[in-house]
Amino acid sequence: MPSIILPPKPTALQKPHINLAVVGHVDNGKSTLVGRLLYETGYVDEKALKEIEEMAKKIGKEDFAFAWILDRFKEERERGVTIEATHVGFETNKLFITIIDLPGHRDFVKNMIVGASQADAALFVISARPGEFEAAIGPQGQGREHLFLIRTLGVQQIVVAVNKMDVVNYDQKRYEQVKAEVSKLLKLLGYDPSKIHFIPVSAIKGDNIKTKSSNTPWYTGPTLLEVFDSFQPPQRPVDKPLRMPIQDVFTITGAGTVVVGRVETGVLKVGDRVVIVPPAKVGDVRSIETHHMKLEQAQPGDNIGVNVRGIAKEDVKRGDVLGKPDNVPTVAEEIVARIVVLWHPTAIGPGYAPVMHIHTATVPVQITELVSKLDPRTGQAVEQKPQFIKQGDVAIVKIKPLKPVVAEKFSDFPPLGRFALRDMGRTIAAGQILEVKPAQVQIK
């Protein structure tokens, strides 16, 4: 049976490439909207979709068909039908867009942190349905948490889809109310809401996604796909040393070890000698593949599978980083970072031990010292060696990883210099690395 989501067409790979994070609260319609986007851009297998629609009809849940596209794709992936990590993509007139980390994953917020560090742009999905909207941006709302995260991770390009407009009868007043509240939140985070597109959509009915809807005559702006076309692809840092955080590793019979990840900086070519750290194992690149197509070389932004000779699967794990022996990725003994405390019930002091999520790695860490507290607006120090910091504070801190992990200065390698601290199932803080004290690494 064909995969429900089609691989990129040859035309797609000629276009500039953008990684899109789809964020928002549970049940606000992210999966349905992604399914709809894939369908509208010709990336859903018609035969497989018909099967799904018939199944949905049988149980009286026709509205579920688009969301089920992703469910079906996830099942295929779990059964090993598709290798691609968690990436699906679609094409607009000007761009090829990869959706990173599909919504609905139980570790979505955690993945958001690792995933969004790869995002060039974000689609924020918010439901106009009374009750759902308020829950999403309330103090406990995931919608709110996701916006804080994409801000901290440096995502500048955002579009807001005000979804489920069909449920509120395409009421302009409700749309304006949602827009005003979300704008307030965006402003608080330092975005300029006047530069962000808000679009009234219905993922289920298809309003304003590919074509202008007659149901919203009061809306004169662009469609969702038109806004995507206005996104600027990032400058890809090809001239920096190679860094590729590893997302996954597996063995293919007859081929050997394959590591999957996204090239963040530098260039990787077939035949290159590479090193994977912290384990400090050296190997050679046999082949590189992206979306089932062979590549001679990979550049920043490429999501790839790399067949490595000389390195065993058990020597490598998610969170390790692939580089070159002449510029080995830095394993951190200690880091100095600027953090913002997003949520904490009491206060944080020296000795606090959360879990750090950095690129694709997850490690236990300890805050060893609070160096200074900063004024969030100016970035100037207002207090040296504070005893504690609390929610809303910005501070410079020293952090010691309790297990080996690769970490780089944010100014050198942004994707490897951004992190989140988590505890109690919540994101406590997000930060940027200012200094790294390197650990000794013996290349084997």
Curated annotation (Swiss-Prot):
Annotated segments matching region G3: 101-104
**Reaction(s) catalysed (UniProt annotation):** GTP + H2O = GDP + phosphate + H(+)
Q: Which InterPro entries match?
A: EFTu-like_2, EFTU-type, G_TR_CS, GTP-eEF1A_C, P-loop_NTPase, T_Tr_GTP-bd_dom, TRAFAC_GTPase_members, Transl_B-barrel_sf
Record bears the keyword ATP-binding: no
Renumbered to this chain, region (G1) spans 24-31
- Every copy of the tr-type G domain together lies at 15-238
Task: Give the domain of life.
Answer: Archaea
| Pfam families referenced in this protein's UniProt entry, alphabetically | GTP-eEF1A_C, GTP_EFTU, GTP_EFTU_D2, GTP_EFTU_D4
- Which stretches does the entry tag as region G4? 163-166
User: GO cellular component annotations, sorted alphabetically?
Assistant: cytoplasm
GO molecular function ontology, one term from the record: translation elongation factor activity
Q: Which residues bind Mg(2+)?
A: 31
Recorded E.C. number(s)?
Answer: 3.6.5.3
The UniProt annotation puts the region (G5) at 202-204
Its protein name is: Elongation factor 1-alpha
Gene symbol here is: tuf
